[in-house]
Amino acid sequence: MPVITLPDGSQRSFDHAVSIAEVAASIGAGLAKATVAGKVDGKLVDACDLISNDATLQIITPKDEEGLEIIRHSCAHLVGHAVKQLYPTAKMVIGPVIDEGFYYDIAYERPFTPEDMAAIEKRMMELIEKDYDVVKKMTPRAEVIDVFTARGEDYKLRLVEDMPDEQAMGLYYHEEYVDMCRGPHVPNTRFLKAFKLTKLSGAYWRGDAKNEQLQRVYGTAWADKKQLAAYIQRIEEAEKRDHRKIGKQLDLFHLQEEAPGMVFWHANGWTVYQVLEQYMRGVQRENGYQEIKTPQVVDRILWERSGHWSNYAENMFTTSSESRDYAVKPMNCPCHVQVFNQGLKSYRDLPLRLAEFGACHRNEPSGALHGIMRVRGFVQDDAHIFCTEEQVKKEAADFIKLTLDVYKDFGFSDIAMKLSTRPAKRVGSEELWDRAETALADALNESGLEWEYQPGEGAFYGPKIEFTLRDCLGRNWQCGTLQYDPNLPERLDASYIAEDNSRVRPVMLHRAILGSFERFIGMLIEHYAGVFPAWLAPTQAVIMNITDKQTDFALEVEKSLNGSGFRAKSDLRNEKIGFKIREHTLLKVPYLLVIGDREVETQTVAVRTREGADLGSMPVAQFVELLTQAVSRRGRQESE
């Protein structure tokens, strides 16, 4: 006679084994109808699963995050049902849940087309309207093999082979279609109405380019149609903000097949890049960093000593010369240790903060490349702090404050901080891990802001802090990191002379704020939709004459603004002023200065903003003051 304890502490007793659905029905008809699954003693189970003993139970509905994941997973199975009806020779592979959606990998004789995707979506809607129950059957291993052998599902059989210890598996039946899964899944297709297929792509079996190519069908699913509509609106807005599209519109950069994953920066984009670099250079100088520069191509001997050659070689570009093997550096850390190792270091020299705008190259798979967000050639705002163990907490606390200030300057204030702690496979004593994790946790606490643990997510040699930015569309971008590392100094024989004259290994703190310049600029483009704050805009002001009579004064204003350190251009074309204003508004120039006869006579400029606000006529000196204030605010609001 199980006693079920609910989240509010109330209890219900039953005189027989009872399903989650039955418990929900005993509470109320509305809850029974909304029940997607249950969480029994903390474990997710299907609504049809039985509880035989005393247990705690949470009813899972579409309002719960777990409920939403179950809906998405079940939608992936629904893709399988529709595909097998439309394309009977297709072989189903896997259909997992991903962030805000799902996908299904499918082996088929030809690539799917957008027309195929529309047909699959239509068939899914028709199947949902049938309002059928999804039936779960725990099935003996041998029978599972028979089921998929009879259906010719070769990939499912391979997946069964991957689970030699599983003697019974969950089969989920969507009418005549059957799929294998740990579950749970929705009890009925009525939960799947708020879905949409979003895109097609290629994939490889087990993610390995050496294996068979598959078709991947992506989709999204939500608790209701209102949430789906909001998501679609957000995605449409994201498409409008696509950095590749805006990059072309604003003439910022381009990419081409002859240099995959390498950016061709145009003058406008390079201006933005240089503003970022000079800003970060100043920030680092103010915070006690020494800027260095290290080689791009380094003998494999160093990479062998650092461990990268054995663990990272497939991601490195290599070359040979005079019977020596070299690698184009994928990261800067080993080279920074070489700088530290030059000359004798004392405890008085620590902390030593070495920074580099380090150009790195990584041989990313071509299918993973994405605009300037995922590239092969990139520059990091990289730095390494060499310090004593006792200095870690202060260095970490200072870095956290610095990082948050930088993000505010770029207009990001919604920051999540996470501390990744010791993984199962690790090196170093428990005492060392305790001290390292405590130092980073104490530094996070000093910030006064909320943060969370990520248990087991640290590197094998040390814990790390991650900074994740949320942009205007609610998307998360992991950017900054602070990685505790006692391992690389050991491998590369870094040491300093302690106060007692003994040789001691320093702790090495790997840190970055932006991550890579390329990706961060891509983020900024999409966050601002190309409408950069004045300090980042490639052109901050454009001066336009109405007729040729104002040319000399327009050029004089341009020279004055550029001489004051701003980025100004004049547009002296023989075009109507309205045409010029529209064009530069579309180019998202922050300030549009119009000069007519009256402005020449009064030695003023008529100032408009790209948003269409008319600020009136003012002396050039007054506009310089206005622009100075706008630039000095950077990406912060006036109230900050």
UniProtKB/Swiss-Prot annotation:
Domain TGS: residue ranges: 1-61
Names of required cofactors: Zn(2+)
Record-level GO cellular component terms: cytosol
Chain spans, region Catalytic: 242-533
One GO term of the biological process aspect: threonyl-tRNA aminoacylation
Keywords from the UniProt entry: Aminoacyl-tRNA synthetase, ATP-binding, Cytoplasm, Ligase, Metal-binding, Nucleotide-binding, Protein biosynthesis, RNA-binding, tRNA-binding, Zinc
Residues that bind Zn(2+): 333, 384, 510
Signal peptide: none
EC class (word): ligase
Cofactor annotation comment: Binds 1 zinc ion per subunit.
Reaction(s) catalysed (UniProt annotation): tRNA(Thr) + L-threonine + ATP = L-threonyl-tRNA(Thr) + AMP + diphosphate + H(+)
Protein EC: 6.1.1.3
Family that this chain belongs to: Belongs to the class-II aminoacyl-tRNA synthetase family.
Cross-referenced NCBIfam families: thrS
Subunit structure: Homodimer.
Protein name per the record: Threonine--tRNA ligase
Protein species of origin: Pseudomonas putida (strain ATCC 700007 / DSM 6899 / JCM 31910 / BCRC 17059 / LMG 24140 / F1)
